[in-house]
Amino acid sequence: MVSNLQQVVKALKQGQVVAYPTEGVFGLGCDPDNEVAIERLLTIKQRPSDKGLILIAADFQQLQPYLDLTSLSAEQLQRVFATWPGPYTWVMPASARASALVTGYRQTVAVRVSDHPLVQKLCSEYGKPLTSTSANLSGQTECKTVEQVQDQLGSQISVILFGEIGERHRPSEIRDARTEQLLRQG
């Protein structure tokens, strides 16, 4: 299959919403600093803005501008780093840069350093994290193939990054970095 990575990066730079394979399902994403793109993503997904989104990245450095690490201990950060890259999402204190649409109007933001090779390439090529939510209409089954994304979301998204999902076959686990509380079973 021919890579369309550059086409996806171009769409992101133009403020468009894209779909891409992750560890367990296809994700929908956009530039986390583009409010119009985030609003479009929420509209496409039919997702309430107070639910928030995940930021997915190639490495921790991409996430740092969106985080306020001052209230996390070295031990708490070590727990987080021990799971990355991988299918583990952590809720951490947000910095002022994190959009309220990404945080769901909370003081925290959900973040993940992906180990999926295409997500790694996409975020590296784009130079920053992406918003991430499962590529499906709210309440519908998550999409696991390009064809399912096309069937469910069709012309509402600009481009789909060609590729296969990882072998997890379910969304990532979500935990609170401060308390370790399990927020979503992975």
UniProtKB/Swiss-Prot annotation:
Pfam families: Sua5_yciO_yrdC
Keyword DNA repair: no
Domain YrdC-like: 2-186
Keyword RNA-binding (UniProt): no
CC terms in the record's Gene Ontology section: cytoplasm
Subcellular location: Cytoplasm
EC number(s) from the headed UniProt entry: 2.7.7.87
Keyword vocabulary terms for this entry: ATP-binding, Cytoplasm, Nucleotide-binding, Nucleotidyltransferase, Transferase, tRNA processing
One annotated GO molecular function: tRNA binding
GO biological process: regulation of translational fidelity; tRNA threonylcarbamoyladenosine modification
Catalysed reactions, semicolon-separated: L-threonine + hydrogencarbonate + ATP = L-threonylcarbamoyladenylate + diphosphate + H2O
Domain of life assignment: Bacteria
Principal EC category: transferase
PANTHER family assigned: SUA5, THREONYLCARBAMOYL-AMP SYNTHASE
Family to which the UniProt record says this protein belongs: Belongs to the SUA5 family. TsaC subfamily.
Functional summary from the UniProt entry: Required for the formation of a threonylcarbamoyl group on adenosine at position 37 (t(6)A37) in tRNAs that read codons beginning with adenine. Catalyzes the conversion of L-threonine, HCO(3)(-)/CO(2) and ATP to give threonylcarbamoyl-AMP (TC-AMP) as the acyladenylate intermediate, with the release of diphosphate.
HAMAP family, alphabetized: TsaC (MF_01852)
Protein name: Threonylcarbamoyl-AMP synthase
Organism lineage string: Bacteria, Pseudomonadati, Pseudomonadota, Gammaproteobacteria, Vibrionales
